[in-house]
Amino acid sequence: MTKREELIKLKPDNHDMRLKYYELVLKSSSLENLPGFSLPKGYRYVYYREGDKKDWIAIETSAREFVLPMEGEAAWEKYYAGKGKELEERMFFVETLDGEKVATATAFYEPRDLSGAGWLHWVAVKREYQRQGIAKALISHTLQRLKELGYPSIKIPTQTNTWVAAGMYLDFGFRPVPENAVNSREGYGILRTLTNHPALAAFEPVPYEEIWDSHMVEIEKKLREQYADLVHFRVLEENGQERILFCTQTGTGEWKKAF
C-alpha cells in the first residue's frame, strides 16, 4: 500500500492529533438571535464553586485535551489562577442528577484582545457523554451568558484538530476572523474538507490525503505497534524538544524512545 493510500484510509476522531494543526479564531457580532438548545433530560447547569478545578481537569482530560493531570494543572494556572470569584459567574458545568460533572464551558475574555469581545472558553464534554446534545445546549447557554455580561461580540478559539467542534461553531453563525482567515487559510481548507460546511465556500478544500500531519501519523503508528490498546496521544513542545504523552485503556505514559 502506498503512503497516499494509507492516508486516504485514515478516519479522523473528533479530537485528532494526526490532523495538521492550525489555530482557528471565529467571531460573531450578531447576538440578538443566538440559537437556543435545551439540555437532554436528566442534566442540569451549575456554576463553578471552589474545589471544582479537579472536575474541570477530569472533563478536559476525558475529552482528550490532556493526557496527564499536570497538563490540566498547568492550563488552569495559565487561564484561571486567582480568578475563582469571577468563575463563580462565568464557568458552567453540566451535571447529572446524581451530581457528576460531565461537561464544562466558560464565558470568559482574552486580556490581550482589545476589541472588547467576550470569549467562549474551554468547551468540553466527557467522552462517554458525547453525542447526546449536551455540547450544543452548553454552548448556547454559555453564549447567552456572554451576551448577558454585555459583550458586543463573541470570539471562539478553536483548531483543526477539534474539527467537529469547529463545525458546530459555524452552525451557530460564527465565521472566521479576517486576519486569521488569511494566516490559517489552509486550516480552513482542511475544515472545509472535513465538514463541507457552506460557510467555508470561499476556502479551497485540501485534498484528503494532505490534511494529515505525516509526523504525527508516524508517531501514532509507532505507539500503536508498542501499545495495541492505545487510546490517544499528545505531543508537547518544550524547549525545542518533543514530549510524547500517551493514554492506553489501562493507563498513561510518556514515550522515551527516539523517532
How does the language model describe each region?
Residues 146-158:
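Conserved GNAT acetyl-CoA-binding A-motif
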Residues 169-179:
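Conserved acetyl-CoA-binding loop of GNAT-fold acetyltransferases
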Residues 233-234, 242-248, 255-257:
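Short linear proline/tyrosine/threonine-rich motifs used for host-factor recruitment
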Residues 122-125, 131-148, 170-171:
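Conserved acetyl-CoA-binding loop-helix of GNAT-fold acetyltransferases
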Residues 44-56:
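A short beta-loop-alpha structural element at the N-terminal edge
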Residues 61-123:
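A conserved beta-strand-loop-helix scaffold within acyl/acetyltransferase catalytic domains
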Residues 1-41:
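Acyl-donor-binding surface of acyltransferase catalytic domains
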Residues 156-166, 182-189:
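Conserved beta-strand-loop-alpha-helix junction that forms the acyl-donor binding cleft
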